[in-house]
């Protein structure tokens, strides 16, 4: 049976992994680590929770330890929380070697980040927008070292290769060595057409061919076999009452859960409503200052909060192994988003539940999801109409009303409205 040493990782790194109680490589690690160490570009696709981070961090750290220079590798990822999580893993793995890791994301001090970059960290973990800002506005003493980077990693590559990130990604890549002078590693849980098209790109002169690997899941279902998928038919106007009843029913009253919503406004309403109802709750969405986002995650990981209300900021890659329940409070329009959300539970062989709240408007979305995952959802009987009306409706309605009044008083969402107005004004001036 293969171990990390036989895959080619440095002895010091295998000892670090052992100290973290990671002794057996996963399928994607077995496949990708030797190929990356050979110098090949790599596209790695695997289910969530399969160990993709170590698949690229392991060989990068091994090569760095042979030639420990500054700005050795750049990892780009779509969200701040993912960047911080990846940085934590790099730091933990390289702790015995005095590794310097810099996190460059929005919501943090630009000045402090510029100072960090001037110190030439060994690895930069960044979101494209903030790194692009430094490249465009900082001097050569800050970002000039990027031109010597040996590795570029796109984590959650299917998201980074969309039009949303196109301009910032292009700016980041422009500051790095050309393709034939660096290794490019793409990792994702969803192999999209854009990712596949890169497999057919011509091989760079003097470089070995690209290595592409995708773990096939049982029956081509992109979700863990230990995940139970259910739905509840819910009237739109009383969703909050159904949620409260579900979270406080006998089966789930002591379990950790992530509640996924489509809008920041919904996340904030639910957080405040559940807090009024004395549920230990935290939230994670783009309208929160970065420090609050970080604190929310820490509270949830430490079980100070039992429930995390989140937009899709939390659906990608975040490793919170103890999540026992995922609730799709709002159904996503993209079936792959459902897969990523549901992948926050039933990780590493554990059992988990994913329950979707289905209103009359969601039927076509549920059918699309079932087609994508090749599995039918079953209706759960954990919450009944009569139970909701009898136990929850009155107090939940009161708590929601008080939450909405408080949000109105605080002008929640005003910053976002002003930003949108500025963008629209700018478009008007250009047209």
From Swiss-Prot:
The record's InterPro entries line, in alphabetical order, gives: DEAD/DEAH_box_helicase_dom, DEAD_box_RNA_helicase, Helicase_ATP-bd, Helicase_C-like, P-loop_NTPase, RNA_helicase_DEAD_Q_motif
Q: What is the lineage of its organism?
A: Eukaryota, Fungi, Dikarya, Ascomycota, Saccharomycotina
Q: Supply the source organism for this entry.
A: Saccharomyces cerevisiae (strain ATCC 204508 / S288c) (Baker's yeast)
Renumbered to this chain, motif DEAD box spans: 155-158
- GO annotation, cellular component aspect: 90S preribosome; nucleolus; nucleoplasm; nucleus; small-subunit processome
Its name, as the record gives it, is ATP-dependent RNA helicase DBP8
- Pfam families reported for this sequence: DEAD (PF00270), Helicase_C (PF00271)
Q: What the protein does?
A: ATP-binding RNA helicase involved in 40S ribosomal subunit biogenesis and is required for the normal formation of 18S rRNAs through pre-rRNA processing at A0, A1 and A2 sites. Required for vegetative growth.
Chain intervals for the UniProt region annotation (Disordered): 404-431
Q: Where is this chain compositionally biased, Basic and acidic residues type? A: 411-431
Q: How does activity depend on pH?
A: Optimum pH is 7.4.
Q: Which GO terms describe its molecular function?
A: ATP binding; ATP hydrolysis activity; RNA binding; RNA helicase activity
Q: Which gene encodes it?
A: DBP8
Regarding protein family, the annotation reads: Belongs to the DEAD box helicase family. DDX49/DBP8 subfamily.
């Amino acid at each position: 049976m293969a171990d990390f040493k036989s895959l080619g990782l440095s002895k010091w790194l295998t000892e670090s992994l052992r100290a973290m109680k990671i002794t057996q490589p996963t399928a994607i690690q077995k496949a990708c680590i030797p190929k990356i160490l050979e110098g090949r570009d790599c596209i790695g696709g695997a289910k969530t929770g399969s160990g993709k981070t170590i698949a690229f961090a392991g060989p990068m750290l091994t090569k760095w330890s042979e030639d420990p220079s500054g700005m050795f590798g750049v990892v780009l990822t779509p969200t701040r929380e993912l960047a911080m999580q990846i940085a934590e893993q790099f730091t933990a793995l390289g702790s015995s070697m005095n590794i310097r890791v810099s996190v460059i994301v929005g919501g943090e001090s630009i000045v402090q980040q510029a100072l960090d970059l001037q110190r030439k960290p060994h690895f930069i973990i960044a979101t494209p927008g903030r790194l692009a800002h430094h490249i465009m506005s900082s001097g050569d003493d800050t970002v000039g070292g990027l031109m010597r980077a040996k590795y570029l990693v796109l984590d959650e590559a299917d998201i980074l290769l969309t039009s949303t990130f196109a301009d910032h990604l292009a700016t980041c890549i422009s500051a790095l060595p050309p393709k034939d002078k660096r290794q490019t590693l793409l990792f994702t849980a969803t192999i999209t057409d854009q990712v596949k098209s890169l497999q057919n790109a011509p091989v760079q002169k003097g470089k070995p061919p690209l290595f592409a690997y995708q773990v096939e899941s049982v029956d081509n279902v992109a979700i863990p076999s230990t995940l139970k998928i259910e739905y509840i038919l819910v009237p739109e106007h009383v969703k909050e009452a159904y949620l409260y009843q579900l979270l406080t029913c006998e089966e789930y009253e002591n379990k950790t859960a992530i509640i996924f919503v489509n809008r920041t406004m919904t996340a904030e309403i639910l957080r405040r409503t559940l807090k009024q109802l004395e549920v230990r709750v935290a939230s994670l969405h783009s309208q929160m200052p970065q420090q609050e986002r970080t604190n929310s995650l820490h509270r949830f990981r430490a079980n100070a909060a039992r429930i995390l209300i989140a937009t899709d900021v939390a659906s990608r890659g975040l490793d919170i192994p103890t999540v026992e329940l995922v609730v799709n409070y709002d159904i996503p329009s993209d079936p792959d988003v459902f897969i990523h959300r549901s992948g926050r539970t039933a990780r590493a062989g554990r059992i988990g539940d994913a329950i979707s709240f289905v209103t009359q408007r969601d039927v076509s979305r549920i059918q699309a999801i079932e087609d994508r995952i090749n599995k039918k959802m079953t209706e759960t009987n954990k919450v009944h109409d009569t139970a909701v009306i009898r136990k929850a409706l009155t107090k939940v309605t009161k708590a929601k009303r008080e939450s909405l009044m408080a949000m109105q008083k605080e002008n929640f969402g005003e910053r976002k409205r002003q930003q949108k107005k500025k963008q629209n004004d700018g478009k008007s001036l250009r047209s």
